[in-house]
Amino acid sequence: MSILFISDVHLSTKSPYITDGFLRFLSYRAMRAKALYILGDLFETWLGDDDYNLLHINIAKALKALNQRRISCYFIHGNHDFLLGQRYARACGMTLLSSNQVLKLASGKKIIILHGDILCANDNSYQLFRKYLRHIIVQRLFLSLPLSIRSRIFSAIRSCCVQHTKYKSKKKLNINLKIATDMLIQNNADIMIHGHTHQPAIHKIYRSKKNVFRIIVLGCWNKYGSMIEVNEKNNDILFTEFPLYEITKY
């Protein structure tokens, strides 16, 4: 049995082909796994657990089907869906995790998993904005507003963020490898898996010939899905990108 990791699916009513591909992924690929870890930004927008719509209902049913097959599902918040709460998590049968976790495999190997936005430490303005949005009081005030007002506020914030991002350098938008490396050292781990940047890659950092850190970055789902599979028996790690319309053949 294997453990699957995905991130940045960005489900939206505006992208039904991604939704269809994700549902096929859950039905065919995830059903054969031991566990599924969703590392944030499952949804393009999340305004609160009271925002019921057909997309949210269908995704909850599909994830609940994993739970009913005794396949564990875990979720780490992303920067698009950090308001996803316990009510929706229960409907999905998934467990909410804190912003970064250390997994210990049966072999003893440790893997750090996180969404990845906290690694973009060179972007000071984003980190300040993130800290503000994640404050419990700010979140409670926002969630107390009518859904229509929340939607307008979110649209305005997103528009500003899109414009602001256009003028940021690649250095600011990418992760800080030193911070990632320090996190691995502090947790006595040698593998990190994250998303957020939409730049799939495998970074190898050599501390010595025998001591190599691997930082694996998941891609954003669009025409292709992105997945990391960890085989607990032999510690094999497989990074895969696959056409969403061919999941049944995968």
UniProtKB/Swiss-Prot annotation:
Keyword Cell inner membrane applies: yes
Q: Which organism is it from?
A: Blochmanniella pennsylvanica (strain BPEN)
Question: What CDD domains does this protein map onto?
Answer: MPP_YbbF-LpxH
Q: What pathway does this protein act in?
A: Glycolipid biosynthesis; lipid IV(A) biosynthesis; lipid IV(A) from (3R)-3-hydroxytetradecanoyl-[acyl-carrier-protein] and UDP-N-acetyl-alpha-D-glucosamine: step 4/6
State the gene name recorded for this protein. Answer: lpxH
Under catalytic activity, the entry for this protein gives: UDP-2-N,3-O-bis[(3R)-3-hydroxytetradecanoyl]-alpha-D-glucosamine + H2O = 2-N,3-O-bis[(3R)-3-hydroxytetradecanoyl]-alpha-D-glucosaminyl 1-phosphate + UMP + 2 H(+)
Where's it mainly located?
membrane
Give binding positions for Mn(2+) 1. Answer: 8, 10, 41, 198
* Claim: Manganese is one of the keywords in the record: yes
Top-level taxon of the source organism = Bacteria
Q: What is this protein called?
A: UDP-2,3-diacylglucosamine hydrolase
The cofactors named for this UniProt entry are: Mn(2+)
